[in-house]
Amino acid sequence: MAGAVPLSFATWQALLNNFAIERAAFTGIEIGVLQSLREIPGFLAFGVVFLLFLLREQSIALISLALLGVGTLITGFFPNVMGLYITTVIMSVGFHYYETIQTSLSLQWLDKDKAPEVLGRIIAVGAFTSIVTFGMIWLAFDLAGLGFTVVYALGGAATVLIALICAVSFPQFPVKIRQHRQLILRKRYWLYYALTFLS
């Protein structure tokens, strides 16, 4: 799943400015609004705590991953202001909720001794996938002559496919420790909270 996020997000990010200007006739104002809308789900990511009352973390992660993929997949089909705003919010909800859950899941499933090494590998897989995705986008445009719609669809579809494969292959990991279902804030972590909020 670590490689699935960059397939969609790197595709969306790499193509966004050119797509917005060339196809949706965006100006600086619309780009500013789009970027603001993209960050709203990030501010609301604490809402994951409430979803935990309804769904397991693994289910939330898979749904979020699929939502990220769907948002990216349909972006190219909506080359207008409202279409790009809506697809961006869909993609962003998936991205931010997945990122919120994946760290928690990783720390639950990994042994404490191996967690730093494995988390480093997970980040490396994501970075490598981003680089490969950027290369594939370049090949798709320059060598294959594909357009925005097809490239967005391929990037998003790859993420959705990975989410579906993970849902079928790993239906339910055992939960060793029961997860808290309430928001816990500790005064001593104020700096971490502030930096996370500002990021």
Describe the function of each predicted region:
Residues 1-42, 190-199:
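Helix-loop boundary and gating motifs at the non-cytosolic
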Residues 3, 71, 82-98, 197:
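Hydrophobic core of transmembrane alpha-helices in multi-pass small-molecule transporters
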Residues 16, 97-110:
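Intracellular juxtamembrane helix-capping segments at the cytosolic ends
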Residues 28-29, 112-122:
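Loop-to-transmembrane helix entry/capping segments in MFS-fold secondary transporters
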Residues 66-79:
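C-terminal ends and interior cores of transmembrane alpha-helices
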